[in-house]
Amino acid sequence: GLAKDAVAIEINNVQRDLSDKLEDNASVSIITIKSNEGLEIMRHTLTAQVLASAVKNLYPDAKLAIGPTIEDGFYYDFLPPKPISIDDLPKIEKEMKKIIANKSTINKSYHSKDEAIALFDEQEEVFKAEIILDSDQNDNFQIYTQELSGFIDLCRGPHLPSLNLIGEFKLTKV
């Protein structure tokens, strides 16, 4: 039913995570995995939580930048210790499928600018720390964490509540 297919909500015309609190008298609609918005949220979760995590597992010294969705998919900008080629994609895809198979829950937490910078400085994620530092925002930085692996990423969200909702995908370009 609708509850089983729900992946996010829209509160006052803003997409939010299912875990977000509702405001009094808010206009609310449910976003399902079968909708265009749900597909975009799945792709966003796939890039921000799965592709980035797989790259960090395989190339621990890679530095993460940003990972948006695009019209027909997603990408993630990162700086690996050595160039990645099209021949590396099957290995990355295999790692992504392992991560998805764990069916990890994804949790969101909010942090001040200083806390968020400290979190990414500790992980030597210079691009993430720079994004936060350059932001006009002072608090409520959203950090998403995979419950099982502890992988974290800075992201605007929303994300799927669990990795087990991710469908089929194929990496095609470097």
What residue spans do the PLM features occupy?
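Short amphipathic, charge-patterned alpha-helical segments
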Residues: G1-L2
